[in-house]
């Protein structure tokens, strides 16, 4: 490995480490998850029922105005059980009060609820009356049919749940949910009658109020992914409440494709099927806590000339699985962070994820898929890396000659560069050739970092001693943090650093002995620092790629001969003298 190659690799590793600093097990059987989900749903329902009053104290006209008659009533709960979740919907607010996923567990392998506020719920409408009253439908009691029941649906079966709030004979609010047996997507339709002259600004908002609960053990890491977002005009708008005690807000006008609240692996996205007037995002981080609370809402117009306004929405509430959200045809996948749109995102979307999805049809273990993927990438880069290795061997053979040239022409830089160029050309070597394969792989490596860091495919999938390929494979936790290294020892990065050391040891180098000794230890150490906090899936990929590279290097070393080395000399070939032409015989 020549000086340019080593310098390039060192700079790349240093950039990766600095960038990281400033950026930041077996599954239970499905039946167990299902039973646990039902238990959690029943618990939520019991908690809500225990707080219910047969009739609330009548609300005053001053607080609710025209909505006062609906501010008291009896809360009734409906449970929906489909293939993917258990949901609880309440007649108070016609809101979703609980949704427990069946196929996903939290970091402690326990079921979790995607609705953080089981008492008030999350999905609602917000009105501002012309008198200045702020009305949240979660404070109002709706009527409906088939309430206080459990509905089970499978596959393509659907179930519609309807609520109605009558304010007067000519004024009402209707809300309808549509559930499908095999989908995380829930239909949410709103019909307003006779309200066009009663609302300030002739608009209302449909909102998801509440951050998604954190599901992973590393709350600080999850906080880096938590956010409220909107997609408008082909651009992603993010709201990140990163500082304690500070309120964050973002509001824009226009036709929004969706608004959403997410944590690291799950999302609640509101998708309008009609044109919107804009969106509003709000967020705040709790003091002394990594948890970030968010609100995301869509602004909808209520034209003064229309007596009845129908608006249709969908709520996607489930995992941030690329293939699943892509299939919604709503651009929700744009919220997934795959790095630079012009470089790493294409590698993630069109190379890594499709390859993993295809291989997963035949291989169920993602550890094996990563190893196969590393082997395939090695095959693709084999011709380039072989040519690079041979070029480095030639460079190593030329070092004595190059040193002699440097001494000979130390006072004539122009002549030195000319002679170096001639020798490189005659020997058929490229001084930068040793660094080229690594540089070409960097977009792929960075893309894999983003995929392994944020994709739910690897979450809670193990391999050998690794319990979860989406997090570091810690074998020892310190209980404190070492700067640049972390709070634990991960085994895969150590093995990977050993392979980096071995690869450098057997690779020809154009460095001096002192340079070689420094880089022989410094570069593996830098890679160890970088990968110790990386997802173990990424460390496994790089480990296996290095193993294949070491095997390739052994093969090249064993099949090379002296005839492969360049045959050049320091002195340039002398030019033949021109024969003087005579004027006579």
Swiss-Prot record:
Similarity comment: Belongs to the OXA1/ALB3/YidC family. Type 1 subfamily.
InterPro entries: Membr_insert_YidC (IPR019998), Membr_insert_YidC_N (IPR028053), YidC/ALB3/OXA1/COX18 (IPR001708), YidC/Oxa/ALB_C (IPR028055), YidC_ALB_C (IPR047196), YidC_periplasmic_sf (IPR038221)
HAMAP family noted in UniProt: YidC_type1
Record keywords, A-Z: Cell inner membrane, Cell membrane, Chaperone, Membrane, Protein transport, Transmembrane, Transmembrane helix, Transport
Protein name per UniProt: Membrane protein insertase YidC
GO BP term, example: protein transport
Entries under Pfam families matching the protein: 60KD_IMP (PF02096), YidC_periplas (PF14849)
Subcellular localization: Cell inner membrane
Superkingdom of source: Bacteria
């Amino acid at each position: 490995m020549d000086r340019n190659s080593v310098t390039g690799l060192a700079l790349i590793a240093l950039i990766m480490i600095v960038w990281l600093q400033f950026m930041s097990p077996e599954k239970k059987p499905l039946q167990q998850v299902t039973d646990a989900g039902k238990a959690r749903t029943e618990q939520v329902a019991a908690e809500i029922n225990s707080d219910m009053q047969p009739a609330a104290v009548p609300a005053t006209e001053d607080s609710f105005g025209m909505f006062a008659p609906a501010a008291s009533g009896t809360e009734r709960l409906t449970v929906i059980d489909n293939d993917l979740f258990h949901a609880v919907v309440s007649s108070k607010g016609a809101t979703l009060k609980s949704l427990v996923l069946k196929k996903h567990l939290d970091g402690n392998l326990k079921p979790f609820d995607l609705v953080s506020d089981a008492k008030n719920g999350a999905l609602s409408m917000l009105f501002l009356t012309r008198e200045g009253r702020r009305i949240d439908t979660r404070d109002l009691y709706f009527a409906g049919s088939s309430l206080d029941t459990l509905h089970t649906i499978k596959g393509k079966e659907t179930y519609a749940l309807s609520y109605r709030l009558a304010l007067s004979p000519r004024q009402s609010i209707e809300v309808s949910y549509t559930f499908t047996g095999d989908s995380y997507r829930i239909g949410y339709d709103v019909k307003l009658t006779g309200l066009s002259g009663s609302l300030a600004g002739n608009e209302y908002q449909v909102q998801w109020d509440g951050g998604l609960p954190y599901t992973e053990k590393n709350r600080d890491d999850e906080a880096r992914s938590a956010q409220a977002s909107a997609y408008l005009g082909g651009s992603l708008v993010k709201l990140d409440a990163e500082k304690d005690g500070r309120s964050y807000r973002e509001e824009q006008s226009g036709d929004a494709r969706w608004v959403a609240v997410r944590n690291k692996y799950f999302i609640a996205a509101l998708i309008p099927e009609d044109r919107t007037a804009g969106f509003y995002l709000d967020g705040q981080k709790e003091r002394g806590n990594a948890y970030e609370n968010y609100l995301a809402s869509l602004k909808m117009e209520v034209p003064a000339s229309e007596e009845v306004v129908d608006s249709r929405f969908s709520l996607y509430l489930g995992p941030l699985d690329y293939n699943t959200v892509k299939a919604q045809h709503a651009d929700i996948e744009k919220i997934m962070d795959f790095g630079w749109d012009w470089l790493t995102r294409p590698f993630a979307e069109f190379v890594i994820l499709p390859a993993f999805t295809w291989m997963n049809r035949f291989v169920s273990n993602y550890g094996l898929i990563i190893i196969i993927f590393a082997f395939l990438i090695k095959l693709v880069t084999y011709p380039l890396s072989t040519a690079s290795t041979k070029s480095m061997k030639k460079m190593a053979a030329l070092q004595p000659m190059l040193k002699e040239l440097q001494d000979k022409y130390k006072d004539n830089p122009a002549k030195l560069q000319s002679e170096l160029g001639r020798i490189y050309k005659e020997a058929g070597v490229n001084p930068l050739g040793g660094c080229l394969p690594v540089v070409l792989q960097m977009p792929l490596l960075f893309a894999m970092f983003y995929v392994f860091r944020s994709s739910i495919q690897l979450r809670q999938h193990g391999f050998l001693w690794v319990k979860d390929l989406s997090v570091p494979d810690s074998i020892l936790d310190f209980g404190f943090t070492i700067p640049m290294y972390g709070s634990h020892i991960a085994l895969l990065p150590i093995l990977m650093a050993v392979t980096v050391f071995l690869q450098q040891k057997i690779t020809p180098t154009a460095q001096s002995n002192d340079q070689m000794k420094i880089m022989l230890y410094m570069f593996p150490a830098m890679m160890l620092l970088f990968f110790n906090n990386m997802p173990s899936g990424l460390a496994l990929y790089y480990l296996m790629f290095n193993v294949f590279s070491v095997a390739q290097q052994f093969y090249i070393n064993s099949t090379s001969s002296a005839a492969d080395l360049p045959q050049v000399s320091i002195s340039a070939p002398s030019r033949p003298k021109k024969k003087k032409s005579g004027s006579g015989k």
